[in-house]
Amino acid sequence: MLPAECSRRLVAELRDALDSCAERQRQLEQSLRVSRRLLRVWEPAETPAPEPTPGSEINKEAPSSACPPSPQDLKELELLTQALEKAVRVRKGLSKAGEGVKARSLKSGSASTATKASAPPSTSRCTGSRAPETKPPRGVHHPWVPAKDLPGHRLLLVGDGAHMGQGAGANKPEAGLRDQQIVPQAASQVPEAFTLKDKGALLRLPEAFRKAASRNARLPMCASSLWAQLSSMQTRDSVDAAAATAKTQFLQKMQTAAGLPSSMLSAAEVGRLQKACSMLRLRMREELTADPKDWTQEYRSLLTLEGLQALAGQCLHRLQELQELRSAVVEQPQGPWPEGPPRAALPCGGGADPVWSPQLLLYSSTQELQTLAALRLRVAMLDQQVHLEKVLMAELLPLLSEQEPLGRPWLALCRAAHCLLCEGGQRFLTVLQDEPADRLSPP
């Protein structure tokens, strides 16, 4: 049996391992849910059916829930129906009477036209002789004279002055009906007002006016094209500025996500600093060992030493910045900064040291990516097993060293320790205890 303190420590370590495994399993399940949600077939969300309003439900239920009509309502409905039928009959009678009057007026008008055509041309009763005028054929259209220029505000045909006096006594009703028919027709054919905006294209302007009009018409087009070019240039400049800003922000976000500061430490800069330091050291040694012959050489030597001192101060300042940068990177949880120079390029597909530059994960197929994920999980599991093995070694080896190597309990303890430490609990060793040779020999 293990001591109580040792058992508690081992149980605590095992519980921590189980908790970490459960947390890892939860993260994997969440990642799987997100991946399935992204890879499933996208379907547009169905539009929800409009919910019926309470008013419509009331209207639908009203006929079914309405009470039967009373006898008084039925009587009023019958009276209303009779009144409507009577109104329809009266309206039909009026329409028939109007059609008869219209037919009689048309017949009388045709008869008067025939008599006018058969009668010889007669002169007008007005003073002054006029040439006989013949009535134009029926298909010819007569221009209308505005009614405001004639007495009585009537619209008359041009050239019908000779026939104004005929049939005045006998055909007065027919003439009245004809006047009533002519007035609406003339009113509908009143000439439209002439506007320069609608019909100005029919005018023939002088040559100078036409040239000026065409030149003025081209100016707005040129101005609009210039404005379009200016707006396109401004839009292009704004798009370029927005793209540059977005690129800078993206690089800053990538550097922040990778855990690297903006002023990254590069191997080339370290090499340049080392070369500058070695050259400064050599030059300083040459100037100090030189023996000036006169005050001019001594003055030049002092100026050279002053310049070398300024360069050395700049190099020291840069080295201090790099040291601060290194300490800041080491304190971050992403991993320590490399202490030595950059190593050779690793065959991992990234093309550079994964510590000195961001490592790129390259894969050629989904199967290779799946294999990489499985190997990553396997490495995490092996790291956890190694940690548990170290804890078991720290707890069990002192117990083995304290007990004497005698008897079966010690052999069972060794077997259990070997199984837990060396085989990972997968296989148990079988220990055989042989009897001495003299006991097995016959007497």
From Swiss-Prot:
InterPro entries referenced in this protein's UniProt entry, alphabetically: DUF4693
Compositional bias annotation for Low complexity: 106-124
Pfam family, one: DUF4693
Subunit and partners: Interacts with TEDC1. Found in a complex with TEDC1, TEDC2, TUBE1 and TUBD1.
Disordered: annotated span: 45-72, 93-146
Keyword Membrane: no
Entry's Gene Ontology BP terms: positive regulation of smoothened signaling pathway
Record PANTHER family: TUBULIN EPSILON AND DELTA COMPLEX PROTEIN 2
Name listed for the protein in its UniProt record: Tubulin epsilon and delta complex protein 2
Coiled coil stretches, renumbered: 8-33
Its job: Acts as a positive regulator of ciliary hedgehog signaling. Required for centriole stability.
Keywords, ordered alphabetically: Cell projection, Coiled coil, Cytoplasm, Cytoskeleton
A GO term from the CC aspect: cilium
Primary location: other
Superkingdom of origin: Eukaryota
Subcellular localization: Cell projection, Cilium; Cytoplasm, Cytoskeleton, Microtubule organizing center, Centrosome, Centriole
Species of origin: Bos taurus
